[in-house]
């Protein structure tokens, strides 16, 4: 197939949805499809066979896009429409594949061009409003809910990335055309690590024998970085030799987090690196003893969880749906999103190397059995088989549903 893919993100940047898009593109390439990707003017090009990247025009003074809804995204989405119009006027496509809010454009395009549409559902749009504390407006939430229903019910095929989203699509009445494909490749990219694990500790002033807990990811409120800081302050009292290594965050976010750590007595055990190249994240993982995911809100499974399962390191996470869709107490330590609980669990893991090793081994076994790359590619092929089958049928007109 020749596919027009619409990705309203800074592709490629080392963060959630762009990682997911990267691996989807890799799978489609391996399956023999040709993809024209229309995306934001921000991000770096990646070399994938059968992929061409077309970027929207960059407006003055726009150099980055924060995660979640924003006015900047609205401007860039509008500019993407011009690039999309040029593509469809010059090329003939067999299918439209859209991500996030571009699903609404994808549904309209598919009807106009008479080709099938696949919606890649990475999150719930209404839930984004609360996750990113963007707005509490009931009107805006109803608008996002309406848009999501149009995208799901107006598509011939839907991919969901976690069980909660799959259940939501089923409740909408589109379960028969949706397929759950977990982001099993996580935040991995096809680049060799540039530094040995030992060099990571040296570079960031961490003693070779210090126990290290690692957090990697963004600093958005729902990620629970402040919870981790509070837990680190408690850990510092009993294990001042330990280090909590935090990889990620914009410079201003890192400065604020470091100030909070200083205020709460955690600064001596915390190391903030800021954003690091995606190819170096495996080295940070291997330089650590425990991997922490302290999320406090949301239902989507973090992409990093899947690569953590294969890492050979134990996972400590909050016992919320965002994690428990994949993690169980047999393959991870799950605790309430509370500083003392997180600190106590971290101290217990630090003090018990045998428990760490056993947890990591069981996690790797589950990853090999349930979350293999082969299964990911196979299910992507199934989604496109459904897309082709759905193209011959009539997609029902979306109906109004009660707001969730």
Language-model segments: residues:
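A short helix/loop element that forms part of the nucleotide-sugar donor recognition site in Leloir-type
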Residues: 191-206
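N-terminal subdomain of nucleotide-sugar transferases
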Residues: 1-45, 91, 157, 235, ...
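Membrane-proximal helix-turn-helix segments that form the acceptor-binding/catalytic region
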Residues: 23, 82-89, 104, 108-112, ...
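Nucleotide-activated donor-binding/catalytic signature segment of Leloir-type glycosyltransferases, i.e.
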Residues: 255-279
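A short, well-ordered alpha-helix in the C-terminal region of glycosyltransferases
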Residues: 202, 348, 355-370, 376-382
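Short hydrophobic beta-strand element within catalytic cores of glycosyltransferases
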Residues: 290, 307, 314-317
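Conserved acidic donor-binding segment of nucleotide-sugar-dependent glycosyltransferases
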Residues: 329-340, 348-354
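Carbohydrate-associated surface elements
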Residues: 164, 184
């Amino acid at each position: 197939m020749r596919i027009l893919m619409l990705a309203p993100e800074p592709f490629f940047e080392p963060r959630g949805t762009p990682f997911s898009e990267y691996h989807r593109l890799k799978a489609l390439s391996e399956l023999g499809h040709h993809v024209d990707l229309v995306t934001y003017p921000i991000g770096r090009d990646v070399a994938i066979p059968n992929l061409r990247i077309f970027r929207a025009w960059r407006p003055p003074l726009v150099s980055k896009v924060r995660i979640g809804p924003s006015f900047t995204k609205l401007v860039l989405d509008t500019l993407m429409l011009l690039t999309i119009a040029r593509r469809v006027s010059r090329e003939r496509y067999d299918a439209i594949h859209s991500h996030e809010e571009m699903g609404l454009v994808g549904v309209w395009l598919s009807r106009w061009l008479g080709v099938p549409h696949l919606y890649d559902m990475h999150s719930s749009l209404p839930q984004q409003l609360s996750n990113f504390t963007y707005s509490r407006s009931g009107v805006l939430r109803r608008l996002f809910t309406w848009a999501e229903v149009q995208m799901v019910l107006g598509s011939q095929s839907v991919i969901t990335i976690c069980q909660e989203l799959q259940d939501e699509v089923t409740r909408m009445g589109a379960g028969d055309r949706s397929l759950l494909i977990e982001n099993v490749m996580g935040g991995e990219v096809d680049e060799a690590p540039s530094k040995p694990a030992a060099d990571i500790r040296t570079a960031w002033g961490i003693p070779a024998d210090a126990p290290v807990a690692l957090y990697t990811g963004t600093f958005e409120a729902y990620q629970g970085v402040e919870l981790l800081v509070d837990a680190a302050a408690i850990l510092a009292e009993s294990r001042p030799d330990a280090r909590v290594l935090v990889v990620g965050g914009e410079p201003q976010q890192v400065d604020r987090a470091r100030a909070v750590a200083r205020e709460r007595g955690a600064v001596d055990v915390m190391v903030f690196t800021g954003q690091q190249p995606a190819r170096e994240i495996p080295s940070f993982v291997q330089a650590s003893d425990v991997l922490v995911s302290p999320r406090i809100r949301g239902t989507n499974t973090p992409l990093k969880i899947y690569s953590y399962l294969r890492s050979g390191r134990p996972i400590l996470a909050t016992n919320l749906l965002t994690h428990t869709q994949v993690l169980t107490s047999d393959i991870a330590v799950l605790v309430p999103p509370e500083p003392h609980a997180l600190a106590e669990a971290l101290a217990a893991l630090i003090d018990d190397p045998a428990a760490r090793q056993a947890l990591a081994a069981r996690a790797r076994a589950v990853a090999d059995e349930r979350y293999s790359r082969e299964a990911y590619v196979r299910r992507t092929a199934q989604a496109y088989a459904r897309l082709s089958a759905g193209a011959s049928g009539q997609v029902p007109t979306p109906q109004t549903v009660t707001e969730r």
